[in-house]
């Protein structure tokens, strides 16, 4: 897979084993991955225009002041139609089209991100992409 800045993925999780497992699997699949363990670190990464982030996975609950919902809002400033993959205590629907998963496994996160990216290469209508994956949120 060719390196494309729109395919750069930011993985935000406080669990280092979960975060690095997902990151390593995505790197092994050929994706460019950046990680963060706090919302503040992730926020700065999202604002770094020299290395734009194309896709975002985050925990809803993060330490300090910036949580996953704030990160999703920041991400949507750049990609209003692309869904964010969010891990929350319970899966649910999102008014923004985000994919909210209830306590996902690393394998689930990997598969959802790969499906989103692959579908975006076939069809730029990311809003349609996310709606097809909402079934994982329930």
What are these regions (language model features)?
Residues 33, 83-84:
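Hydrophobic anchor at the start of a short beta-strand
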Residues 37-55:
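Acidic, metal-coordinating helix/loop segments flanking the phosphotransfer/catalytic sites
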Residues 86-88:
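Hydrophobic/aromatic residues positioned on beta-strands within the core alpha/beta folds
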